[in-house]
């Protein structure tokens, strides 16, 4: 069990509350310095009270060093997964990094992100010339998609999982693994559907030995 503590909020239009990092007190003006302190305290509090290290979303690659010592998992979201700096930064991390499929639902984009993260790179990070050795624990997260009409396209069904398994088989990737995000476009943002979706994913996993190896877990929202 990894508590999911997301301290940043990606906004589709750039407007609205952007999370604890930007605005630790919603009733006051944004304060990034106070936000950095607040997000560290949040993750440390979870560790102290539960004994469980937490997960966060890497929305801003240059900020992840503020939490480098307190996280055990990071996810790269649907709107960031095609960004090169996110992929390169993930290649230098020593914890598992999950790459979500983009909002279009395109699985090839997600897998290309995993390929990039698993390879070594040489790039500029926070003003420094850095080299990475690649992150063999980079993997995929299925979160569903949205078509051009704004309709949700779930990708947690048995056929979707088998399609991902087949695509993994065509790539030279280490440690093939997938997490199913049972909210977002997989549930149509109907949080009560998560229980049913988890049951279906577990059934598919138990039914097929290949999926039992590939599907490592589920991601839920409270």
Predicted regions and their residues:
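Redox- and metal-dependent alpha/beta enzyme cores, enriched for Fe-S-associated oxidoreductases
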Residues: 164-169, 173
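Conserved, mostly hydrophobic/aromatic
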Residues: 180
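Active-site-facing alpha/beta catalytic cores
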Residues: 2-163, 184-185, 189-200, 204, ...
């Amino acid at each position: 069990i990894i508590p999911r503590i997301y301290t940043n909020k990606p906004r589709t239009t750039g407007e609205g509350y952007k999370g604890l990092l930007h605005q630790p007190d919603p009733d006051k003006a944004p304060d990034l310095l106070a936000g950095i302190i607040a997000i560290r305290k949040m993750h440390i509090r979870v560790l102290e009270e539960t004994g469980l290290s937490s997960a966060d979303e890497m929305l801003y690659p240059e900020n992840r060093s503020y939490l480098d010592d307190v996280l055990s998992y990071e996810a790269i979201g649907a709107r960031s997964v095609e960004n090169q700096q996110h992929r390169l930064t993930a290649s230098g991390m020593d914890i598992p990094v999950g790459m979500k499929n983009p909002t279009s639902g395109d699985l090839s984009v997600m897998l290309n992100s995993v390929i990039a993260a698993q390879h070594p790179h040489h790039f500029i990070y926070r003003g420094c010339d850095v080299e990475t050795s690649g992150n063999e624990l980079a993997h995929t997260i299925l979160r569903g998609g949205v078509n051009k009409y704004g309709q949700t396209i779930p990708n947690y069904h048995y056929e979707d999982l088998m399609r991902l398994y087949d695509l993994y088989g065509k790539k030279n990737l280490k440690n093939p693994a997938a997490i199913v995000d049972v909210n977002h476009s997989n549930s149509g943002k109907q949080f009560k559907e998560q229980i049913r979706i988890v049951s279906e994913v577990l059934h598919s996993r138990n039914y097929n030995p290949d999926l039992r190896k590939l599907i490592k877990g589920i991601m839920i929202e409270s």
